Structures are given as C-alpha cells and as structure tokens.
UniProtKB/Swiss-Prot annotation:
Organism annotation: Carassius auratus
GO biological process: adenylate cyclase-activating adrenergic receptor signaling pathway; adenylate cyclase-inhibiting adrenergic receptor signaling pathway; positive regulation of MAPK cascade
Keywords annotated in UniProt: Cell membrane, Cell projection, Disulfide bond, G-protein coupled receptor, Glycoprotein, Lipoprotein, Membrane, Palmitate, Receptor, Transducer, Transmembrane, Transmembrane helix
Annotated protein name in UniProt: D(1) dopamine receptor
Disulfide bonds: 97-187
C-alpha cells in the first residue's frame, strides 16, 4: 500500500512538474515575442528619424523619437531580466536587483512622461498654431524632453540607491533576506507607502490627468473646426444650388454634408479614444495595485494580500504599452513610407505608401 501511495505521489508530482514546465515554456515564448516586437517597432522609429531628413526636420517628431528611445530602453534594460525570472522561477541576477528596479522605474516613468509631453505639444499645436510655429523651436523641444528624462532619473536612481523606496522588513525571515551577506533568489521591489504614493503621482496620475485635459480640449477644438468647415461647405453648396436653380437636390446635399461632418468628428474621437484607451488600460491596473499593496495587510498565513502572479501580470500589461506606442504615435503616412523603405517592402506592401490614417500631428 505504501508503495502504491509512493507511486501515485510520484505520478502526481511528475504531472505537476510537466504542466509547470509547459506553462513556463509558453510564458517564455509569449514574453519573447512581446520583447522582440517592442525592440523592432521602436528601433524602426529611431532608424526612420535618423535616416530621413524630412522626419528630422519636424520638431514634433523629436517627442516621438524620445518616446521611442524610452520604450527601447524598457525592452533592453527592463523586460528581458524579468522575462528570465518568470521562466526560471527565481531572480538569478543577484545584486543587480536594485539597479534593475531603478531602470524599471526610470524607463517606465520616462515613457509615460514622454506621452504626456506629446499630448501637451499636440494641444499647443492645435490650439495656437501660429504661436506654435514661432515658439516651438528645437531648443524648446529639447528643454521639454530633458525635463521629462531628468524627472525620471530623479524619481528612480536617487531613492533606490539610497534605499528610500523600500518597505520596512517585517518578521525574522524578511529581516534576514534583506541582509547583504546572505544570498537571495528574490528581487524584492516592495515599496513603502510614501514612495509608492509619491512615485505613482509623478509617474502616472498627474501625467494621465494632464493627458485627459489636453486630449479633451483637442477634441473640442477639432469639433469646432470641423463644424466651421462644414458650415462653410454647406453655404458654398447652397449658393451653388441657388445659382444653378436646382432646389430639388438641396436637402440631399445638406444631409450628405451633415454626414461628412459627423464622420470627421467620429474619426477624431476614435483616434483620441485609442490613444487614451490603450494607455489607461495598460497602466491603470498596475498603478492601482502599486498604491494598494503597501497599505493592505498580509493574510493570516503570512502571504501578501495580492498574489505576486497577479501583480506581475499587470506589470507586463504596463510594459506592453511600449510595444503599442510605435503603432499609435508613429504610424502616420510619413512614418509608414519610411518603414516600408527601411523594410524593403514598397512593392510587397503598397498600402503602406498610399494609405492614410487619422493623425493628430501638427505637421
């Protein structure tokens, strides 16, 4: 009977290990595709701006290239190390943990702040186009970009290297695990309450509030401009109808004009909804958890109130935003032509040369 129990236990354990191995392989494949797509998309953006002068000449593209660099750094300095940890089941890089945490905070914050700067740039370009043309020089753009990167460095490396970010260890095991002279296979990135709230405000909540305000104003301005243009078009059509004495078709022409106006407004709304929707869906769940975890108590058996797996899933959701940004922000007609040339597929993908997409770029 004991032999039977032992055999049954062995079968169950081997089945569990096989299932766990399969999950790790699938996870590794999925994360590899995500990392490679992030690298490819953002490398293409950087290469396009570097190679084609007409893309470099537009100041608004300075912000796009800064965003691409920050997302490229996420794919190089942050994602691969975490992917290896997910597959291996432990942190194999030892003392590199603190530097990696600092890179994670810096690159993710830089990506989000660059998105915020882009929204401000586009609002300024649409709300005051003549003033924008005079004032938005390469120097002003570099100052705005430098501000985003400086804030990202200040909020990451200084607190992490000085250990201001860490939650106080609780219990004997955590105190021992925090000692430098003991090896650890876990990269503990748990934050204290002060740092979790302050960093989340700077890295996400304030930028997302600015983006909501700017894109709402952009939609209102675009809506007014579309309706003004449609009114002028209808007036011109009415004058033409009266001149040609073709009153019978006036209602049909006016109806088609209203439909065209509605279509234009819907197009702008869809573009803005995609921009904000993708960003919020990727990052909001993580930052909600980031602020919750330091305040929630551990369960009676000592486990964290939010499982590490759940937290890791939402961390990857946030990083996935870096793979989507090149599609959203650098997929207008100019960039698509450049991508087609770089990839050598002008003949294979002619749609990339001629197709138009709604874009909020000024130029």
């Amino acid at each position: 009977m004991a032999v039977l129990d032992l055999n049954l236990t062995t079968v169950i354990d081997s089945g569990f290990m096989e299932s766990d191995r399969s999950v790790r392989v699938l996870t590794g494949c999925f994360l590899s595709v995500l990392i490679l797509s992030t690298l490819l998309g953002n490398t293409l953006v950087c290469a396009a701006v570097t190679k084609f002068r007409h893309l470099r000449s537009k100041v608004t593209n300075f912000f796009v290239i800064s965003l691409a660099v920050s997302d490229l750094l996420v794919a190089v300095l942050v994602m691969p190390w975490k992917a290896v940890t997910e597959v291996a089941g432990f942190w194999p890089f030892g003392a590199f943990c603190d530097i990696w945490v600092a890179f994670d905070i810096m690159c993710s914050t830089a990506s989000i702040l660059n998105l915020c700067v882009i929204s401000v740039d586009r609002y300024w370009a649409i709300s005051s186009p003549f003033r924008y043309e005079r004032k938005m020089t390469p120097r002003v753009a570099f100052v705005m970009i430098s501000g985003a990167w400086t804030l990202s460095v200040l909020i990451s490396f200084i607190p992490v290297q000085l250990k201001w970010h860490k939650a106080q260890p609780i219990g004997f095991l955590e105190v021992n695990a925090s000692r430098r002279d003991l090896p650890t296979d876990n990269c503990d990135s748990s934050l204290n309450r002060t740092y979790a709230i302050s960093s989340s405000l700077i890295s996400f909540y304030i930028p997302v509030a600015i983006m909501i305000v700017t894109y709402t104003q952009i939609y209102r301005i675009a809506q007014k401009q579309i309706r003004r243009i449609s009114a002028l078009e209808r007036a011109a059509e009415s004058a033409q109808i009266r001149h040609d004495s073709m009153g019978s078709g006036s209602n049909m022409d006016l109806e088609s004009s209203f439909k065209l106006s509605f279509k234009r407004e819907t197009k702008v709304l869809k573009t803005l909804s995609v921009i904000m929707g993708v960003f919020v869906c990727c990052w909001l769940p993580f930052f909600i958890l980031n602020c919750m975890v330091p305040f929630c108590k551990r369960t009676s058996n000592g486990l964290p109130c939010i499982s590490p797996t759940t937290f890791d899933v939402f961390v990857w959701f946030g990083w996935a935003n870096s793979s989507l940004n090149p599609i959203i922000y650098a997929f207008n007609a100019d960039f698509r032509r450049a991508f087609a040339i770089l990839l050598g597929c002008q003949r294979l993908c002619p749609g990339s040369i001629s197709m138009e997409t709604p874009s909020l770029n000024k130029n």
